[in-house]
Amino acid sequence: MTITRRLPLAASLLCAAIVLGAADRAPFTFPRSTPEAQGISSAALLGFIDAAEKQVDALHSFMLVRHGQVVAEGWWSPYAADEPHVMYSLSKSFTSTAVGLAVAEGKLTVDDLVLGFFPDSVPADPSANLRAMKVRDLLTMSTGQHDEDIQNFPYLADENLVKKFLALPVAHKPGTLFVYNTPASYMLSAIVQKVTGQTVVDYLGPRLFEPLGIKPPVWEASKQGISLGGFGLNIRTEDIARFGQLYLQKGMWQGKPLLPAAWVEAATSRQMSNGSSTTSDWEQGYGYQFWRCRHGFYRGDGAFGQYCIILPQYDAVIAITSGTRDMPGVLNLIWDRLIPALKPAALSTDKASSDRLASKLSGLMLPAQAGEPTSAAAKSAVGRRYTLAPNAQTAESIALDSIDARGEAAFTIRTAGADQHLVAAPGAWRKASMTINGVAEPVAASGGWTADDTYTLKVARYRTPFVITYSLRFAGDQVVVDTEQNAGFSEPGRFSQWVGRAQPAATQGSK
């Protein structure tokens, strides 16, 4: 199904009424229910969680909504229910929603030509393919551009990114070839901003976020002040579930339409072929910034396992955040473990399994670093500041300030002229703050001695998918720090090494 015309005036007036009425609604919260009351066994959910912990490295949160009620929810500490998590490309589905709302308000159509929105950024001699590119082609990632031409798009550059996009080669007729295209999502955001006078995040405020009870989120923007569109949104797990429930209900929310059902149908249908494999959930077709899945489901997803999965046949929504390199593995677990357990009617009460599930969900924890509380090297390392050779992370020095009998260790890492303090202990997480890439963010640390000369420090950036492991090897006056990250856009493994030497005793603590 496609949408080619502006909706009539009545629909536009309806959208305006929705915006005006958003502030009058009571704050929304999902009702909670037992799994059995909604047709799924607690034992099956427990089996899914156990399998995920063994097979996926690692889920950060999980929420299952059935018949409009939350039947299971859990966060692996230090990740928490009230903390936002970066969405990566799951942001695209929200950008698509902004386009749908703008279409409903008569501000554009999916058949509008892209060049028409940006007359001042059109190349001197635009190709026929560029001239033919429509909003629909941006939505379906069928712009006609080659992958190598959109790689390394400079999202945070000073230059005009709209002009940059329009200058890229368009080798194929738009609408004929699927190529995953995050710059196209940026262009959708730019178009929404052009026709509404608001960034996507501000435009969605009264139209989506407020009615769904989503606190005003952070959405990263380009230096031109345009929400990045294809990534950069930060929201909570329950916010993902609410968004999925809106789509499951075909745009209805608390008995009122927020999003036209025709848009929901078009956005989540197969608009573009993206492969022919019957076993890949990345080749079942693509809608308007939504993926089709096997078994007739659909989803929005983001790098390293951020998921909003809608199961219309089962009246269910699954929201997941994670930090994994095995995104297909997460979906396969859901298909294999959860889908067969979704029954059409309520099940008999199973108090024993229900209690075990509740206990499991309340005690979830990301594996903390194990280790000994002390070692042979600890005595000589404590209290010394090691000056580091120049490195890409701008880390200048590291010091093990203290360590107690239980192994609780205090570290100071000096980065870009500022001291950052961490406390870590074996088998537990200790929260702190670190400045990473110039931005302060909350983290949690754990650590212990994993060899006589080695202290292993694990730092979870618990609003992101990322966990960084620092292995500090002490030898005399020298320390070598190997750093690894659980997930990233490059191959796994060590991504940097710092080498440092202890300052003379007289200068310890002088900085």
Label each PLM-derived region with a short phrase:
Residues 22, 348-511:
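Peripheral terminal and inter-domain segments
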Residues 46, 68, 85-111, 138, ...:
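Active-site SXXK
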Residues 49-80, 315-318:
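A short, well-structured edge-of-sheet supersecondary motif
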Residues 86, 105-143, 167, 198-235:
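Active-site helix/loop module of the DD-peptidase/beta-lactamase fold
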Residues 141, 184-191, 231-252, 306-323, ...:
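Active-site-proximal alpha-helical segments within enzyme catalytic domains
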Residues 145-221:
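A small/polar active-site loop signature that marks catalytic segments
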Residues 216, 264-318:
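Active-site Gly/Thr loop motif
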Residues 302-368:
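Structured C-terminal helix/loop/strand segments within mature extracytoplasmic catalytic/sensor domains
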